[in-house]
Amino acid sequence: MISAALAAGLALTMTVTAFADEPYTAYNYDYWDDAIPSQSAYRVEKTVTGADMGLDRLSDPSDPLYISDDAPAKLSDAKDLFYDQDNDTFWMCDSGNNRILRLDTDLKVTGCYTGFTGSTEISVGEDGRSTFLNPNGIYVKKSIFDDKLYVYIADTDNSRAVKCTVESGTEMTLVQEYTKPDTKLYDSETFNPSKILADKAENIYVVCKSVNTGSVQFNKDGEFQGFY
């Protein structure tokens, strides 16, 4: 279930209710990712499963969204949900299944991305595609420079963030890859992006669990700019 994520993603359609009136127990996560009791900010209107989304399409060879015969039809440890207002589209990190899902406003699957093509040496398979590994964060934005739609992904266990274009319902192409900065200013031993966003100038801001000095900032060309 992704009730907590949908509560945030569909906030505009939900109503604030008193804690005592909630038909369920609300929770949040502390620094150690342990669930702790919390007051509810919104009432959940709907919960959605992989079956509701139509994820069985991903294992149907006759479907244009076919990924593989054993593509999971269930969600696994979904970590992030982003709503693209310009295109009325939801994007989800189905983290445990190492993939990104694109959904319509009825939360039906319209795209599934397990990786991308492009120039990288990280997690590249025999087919030349680089695959995602436990992606935790996603952000989608249309560029003011070229009017293209870019998808920014915090590819956590591959120790990178990526910027991609969407080519079809199953294919992405790499535009820019962001890895651990090679500078003394970045003194953490690891680079483990968990959340990501971009501004109008296409600077990106990456939240890393191993960094406590702010988000890691890169410019449009992938150069480390410091912390924000």
Where are these regions (language model features)?
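Sec-dependent N-terminal signal peptides
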Residues: M1-L10
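Sec-dependent signal peptide cleavage junction
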Residues: L12-P23
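Eukaryotic scaffold repeat domains enriched in small/polar residues
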Residues: D21-Y228
